[in-house]
């Protein structure tokens, strides 16, 4: 089981985001409905600068997202930048993801697969990804731990409350058959959907901004 640390979240927009969620403004989106649905979220991630394609420009929506890729996306989406050093021997300083792993470890929202390994190329499960993002949004786990997913019994004990919260706020949806498939590797496309729902409208530059009639979350990272 992957150890997940709650850590301290430093976000200027945390209070605003929490208020929006508590007011119930997060729209309930349809269950995952194929390539067109996923592609729109991937394009939004690219437009915001949270996700990039490979050297050929391919976004590979159906490929599992690695641990290194996932923390990189989270850091960009939430504006994390603080470096503090990490103990991982399998994260060379020359690796493209080295700084983001350091940031994620320093922020405290993810730990290694052991005291000295991070396993950057390993995949991450759907329940792990949902918990990481839910904790970063400062949302507390539901005490009832009830979800409407048909395979809720497959959820790990440590994830039930957080998944219930994520589902209640519309951060996660199931598949057309009503299942959540918590142990499945989360794909790049699914990760994009999760992050876009969480951050809503990002404000990444300093100054006065008009959000118009925006409904949902607003994340301030400038």
Stretches found by the model and what they are:
Residues 2-41, 46-99, 106-127, 133-160, ...:
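Feature responds to low-complexity, polar/acidic, surface-exposed segments characteristic
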Residues 163:
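Active-site/catalytic core of tyrosine-dependent DNA strand-transfer enzymes
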Residues 186-190:
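Acidic helix/loop microenvironments that form the catalytic cleft of cell-wall polysaccharide enzymes
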Residues 194:
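Aromatic- and glycine-enriched pocket-lining scaffold segments that form the walls
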